[in-house]
Amino acid sequence: MLEQMGKAAKAASYQLAVLSTAQKDRALLTIADLLEAESATILAANALDLADARQNGMSEALQDRLLLTQERLSAIASDVRQVCRLTDPVGQVIDGSMLDNGLKLERRRVPLGVVGVIYEARPNVTIDVASLCLKTGNAVILRGGKETYRTNAATVKVIQQALSQCGLPAAAVQAIESPDRELVNQLLKLDRYVDMLIPRGGAGLHKLCREQSTIPVITGGIGVCHIYADDSIDFDKALTVIESAKVQRPSACNSLETLLVNQRIADRFLPELSKKMAAAGVTLHASPSAMPYLTGGPASVVAVEEANYNDEWLSNDLNVTLVDDLDAAVAHIREHGTQHSDAILTRSLTNAERFVREVDSSAVYVNASTRFTDGGQFGLGAEVAVSTQKLHARGPMGLEALTTYKWIGYGDDLIRA
């Protein structure tokens, strides 16, 4: 089955690669319109997936990732329309020159070809990835988790219907609908047809792809995100950022998981933090150094375990620990972070610049929430993933990250001397 899907995707990629921007945008607008027109069908499929998830004991955090509502679906359709307004990178000349040997040489952006994406309980990924791949002239093979197979099937059917209406191959967007895990292993070996693989899920999925795939893999999306509260902060402003970073959408990979507080302000700041987090329904997981300042406060407090520093909560839970200074904060992030998104809250320009230089994450913030690590917030449109590696892309992966380049040489019946 996958062999045929791969062949069909590769054939479709050749057709997509030569489409004009107008043709691609027409397809995307048709997809957005049909997503809204067929929303009842998609939401009904999602409701069945969600019912199974509850019955199987899925955590509330993962249920939130799985859930589609009319509002969320409308926002996704709006994101697709936003992709139309983005500049098409395909065909752009990156650089060029006239060489001494008479060759006019240029480097031009081209599609990758076929992209494979493996993801878990995230039905929005189906549409986000499909829209970005289509805009950049790439075909895509999607493998969502078993938790979302009804939602994904309904969504891909709508996308393929839109493609057919626009005279484009339905095989440009395909989904592996079977929940059989063996098909994941087969996809990882489909390097004859698939040019890049992107896993979006937990650490286990990323490890499997890194170790087993014969296709180049882009890993990331696991976000153990930190905020360091320096001793120079404005308490009220800092608490607002911390609250938003934690509770705006706790299940997101860019939500705050560990708060590092300069020990010089612990006696004044942590009681205020307790009030803020209590109002937001956040449970604090305190280190031994932070516990005395939080015990007896209004927020629920438990002792942090060392393993908590290395994992995503994806829920209304927050690790809190004290650090002596900026050096200690950076050291903690280096030891426990995932190079996703980390922030400093400070009024010291010197400390801000040091933090930016020394924290080696894909996105680093000064006096801003980690929640900004998002393709839409970065002006990239819907993202295909957030890469925490350094090759071939880093951070939110927008359109350019779904292209490569080719060298093109022009001559006048030119031969090499």
Swiss-Prot record:
Q: Which reaction does it catalyse?
A: L-glutamate 5-semialdehyde + phosphate + NADP(+) = L-glutamyl 5-phosphate + NADPH + H(+)
Q: Please state which protein family the record places this protein in.
A: Belongs to the gamma-glutamyl phosphate reductase family.
The record, for PROSITE patterns, names: PROA (PS01223)
UniProt keywords, alphabetically: Amino-acid biosynthesis, Cytoplasm, NADP, Oxidoreductase, Proline biosynthesis
Q: Which Gene3D superfamilies match?
A: Aldehyde Dehydrogenase, Chain A, domain 1, Aldehyde Dehydrogenase, Chain A, domain 2
Record-level GO BP terms: L-proline biosynthetic process
Enzyme nomenclature, EC number: 1.2.1.41
Output this protein's name: Gamma-glutamyl phosphate reductase
Identify the species of origin.
Pectobacterium carotovorum subsp. carotovorum (strain PC1)
User: Its Gene Ontology molecular function terms?
Assistant: glutamate-5-semialdehyde dehydrogenase activity; NADP binding
Named in its record, the pathway it takes part in is: Amino-acid biosynthesis; L-proline biosynthesis; L-glutamate 5-semialdehyde from L-glutamate: step 2/2
| Principal subcellular localisation of the protein | cytoplasm
Top-level enzyme category: oxidoreductase
Q: Where does the record say this protein resides?
A: Cytoplasm
Q: Does the keyword NADP apply?
A: yes
Q: What does this protein do?
A: Catalyzes the NADPH-dependent reduction of L-glutamate 5-phosphate into L-glutamate 5-semialdehyde and phosphate. The product spontaneously undergoes cyclization to form 1-pyrroline-5-carboxylate.
Q: Which GO terms describe its cellular component?
A: cytoplasm
